[in-house]
């Protein structure tokens, strides 16, 4: 349980921090997608209904003793009992059941950090098909913008001469294309001044900018 992590699926002996952060690689115990839910082979599962940071200590401090710390004024817990499939069924009855992803998403994805140009994308696709490797997705990571890692949702005009045609060509070869995106904008990003001016960024509890970068507020009707 507890969401995406590069650590072992069995959490016994681990201390897990459930808070969205950039893990800076798989060598840390931080995570992009924490989920405040876990199951035990002792026949129970627990969902922590909070958006606050949570720490679950599964015997890391004291063997055989589970502890939980929640940064919230209220403790709102749901406890489920039964077989794992029954626990998952009850949990998803509560929070919602996921839809089945398309079949191609379970196929092979080809990527690295990072393909910087249209030519690289074409070359990778050609080599895959030439060598008859099964592949469904080509993923362009952090380098498809003008400045690496600074997402502005626009292909670099210097390195991607005709991205629309590239997408069509790759589709005709049987590839889906995935583009790395992140809704944060550094002060050097061309959209940063506009987001500040239009008040379209996520604020902290004091109504202030919590970090140097801004995170796009998708709840803003504008």
Annotate each language-model stretch with its function:
Residues 1-102, 112-113, 118-119, 125-130:
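Catalytic and substrate-binding clefts that recognize carbohydrates or anionic sugar/phosphate headgroups
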Residues 99-222:
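Aromatic-lined carbohydrate-binding/catalytic grooves of carbohydrate-active enzymes
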């Amino acid at each position: 349980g507890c969401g995406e992590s590069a650590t072992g699926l069995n959490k016994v002996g681990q201390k897990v921090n459930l808070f969205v952060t950039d893990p800076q690689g798989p060598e840390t115990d931080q995570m992009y997608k924490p989920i405040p839910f876990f199951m035990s082979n002792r026949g129970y599962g627990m969902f922590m209904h909070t958006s606050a940071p949570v720490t679950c200590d599964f015997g890391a401090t004291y063997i055989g003793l589970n502890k939980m710390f929640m940064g919230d004024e209220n403790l709102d817990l749901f406890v489920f009992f039964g077989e794992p499939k029954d626990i998952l069924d009850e949990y998803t009855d509560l929070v919602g059941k996921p839809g089945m992803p398309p079949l191609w998403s379970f196929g092979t994805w080809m990527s690295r950090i990072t393909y910087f140009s249209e030519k690289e994308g074409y070359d990778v696709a050609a080599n895959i098909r030439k060598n008859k490797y099964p592949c469904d997705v080509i993923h362009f990571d952090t380098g498809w913008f003008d400045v690496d890692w600074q997402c502005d949702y626009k292909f670099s005009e210097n390195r991607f001469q005709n991205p629309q045609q590239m997408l069509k060509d790759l589709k005709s070869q049987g590839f889906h294309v995935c583009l790395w995106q992140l809704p944060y904008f550094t002060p050097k990003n061309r959209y940063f001044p506009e987001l500040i001016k239009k008040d379209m960024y996520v604020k902290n509890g004091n109504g202030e900018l919590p970090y140097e970068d801004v995170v796009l507020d998708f709840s803003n009707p504008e």
